[in-house]
Amino acid sequence: MAGTFHWVIATAFILTYPLAYYIVLVLHSDRTAPLFRPLINLHFVLGMIVLFLVIPRLLWRIFNVEPEEAPGSRVEHILSKLAHWGLYALMIVMPLTGYLGTSGPPINFYLFEMTKFPNTALFQWLQLDWATFEPIVDVIHHFVGKWIAWFVVLLHIAAAFYHHFVRHDTVLIRMLPERVGNWLLAK
């Protein structure tokens, strides 16, 4: 189950990036461009998938037996735990700040509609000023997305490859789908 959560969340999280870069670099964030609305909606949906799946993923992590720790020093184990909790923080911060920074009419995804944060009772109850609130959330979303998320994700991938190609342990194998893991074991 942990592997399924891992790959669905990782796929959704990673796919948000080419969409965001296409919107910014190719469409120049032009809201009138024909592809802007479908791409930004897909970016948003993928972010919400990450946010909605990270809760059961965290519950699974907390209430189930963790896999056996890979060989390594105490420092490596501490760094591994910090990196994993950093990934969980990213899986919450990125989609949450993305949602909190949206305004305007509800987004119609055809299967459901999602009310944007400033139109919610919570926003009204908190008595927030959108002109003050939105730029702060937007800066967090874009700064973390551009500078921190890529670093942490690439560090995670590098660590998996390090375990596989340098340490020759099963850390990478046990997180891959069974057929891929078996193929790598045969090599």
What label would you give each PLM region?
Residues 1-187:
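Membrane-embedded alpha-helical bundles that constitute the cytochrome b-like, heme-associated redox core
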